């Protein structure tokens, strides 16, 4: 499984694996998954919502958000610690994932100024985050899925812990992480995935560790033992995830769009760091922005 697939799987893979397991485990699992997914459903109010018809197998986009609230008992709005745009195109049999740095310098609608990308969620939740990314990339953002930091921790614990191959020795939050294969519980996985200041690659190194944690979760979810613990997994998902995709939408994606998951292309919107008023940002030049915009437009069949 490619790194891109592992990122995509943290949000859809867990749900779809459980859904597809219904065939072998019967009506009770179907009912439990349905009820849990109903709890995650949360529509968004947008001035101009981009519509897509999943019944016609049209390409669609989804904004994937990892939110830095829910950990350590925090309940405030939080910010989007991770932002990924996913496009799913069954005709081309491809899913494209583009990561956007949290410090990307962007216009945030209604704020009258430019700011960090991850502040959009703090100012206006998923709706404003979707509007901000839609305006910045000049593509329609059809749906969103968000999961908070508590969700990551609870998912790791629900699957009984994970293993990752670590390539950097460092300490974070009282935990020591050494080079090689290491075992992580939920608290350790959270600390492992959040470190960036000791990493020579900064935020990009942090994103790499997030992908490794995702890989560990997905590997456990795909195992028989993890599926048998589906109640704990469903609880972690339903308590910590929000999306405007209904359970019926997820079923359509699982069954009608699976050809698009055979090829997953991963990309990163690359910026250059700069300081302004003592705050660090990432600025993306026009050539790089245009490159990514066109890549996503091609996948969504838009001009």
UniProtKB/Swiss-Prot annotation:
Extracellular side: 28-303
Pathway(s) per entry: Cell wall biogenesis
Subcellular location: Cell membrane
Protein name (Swiss-Prot/TrEMBL): Polyisoprenyl-teichoic acid--peptidoglycan teichoic acid transferase TagU
GO biological process: cell wall assembly
First-level EC class: transferase
Stretches in topological domain Cytoplasmic: 1-6
EC nos: 2.7.8.-
Family: Belongs to the LytR/CpsA/Psr (LCP) family.
PANTHER family: POLYISOPRENYL-TEICHOIC ACID--PEPTIDOGLYCAN TEICHOIC ACID TRANSFERASE TAGU
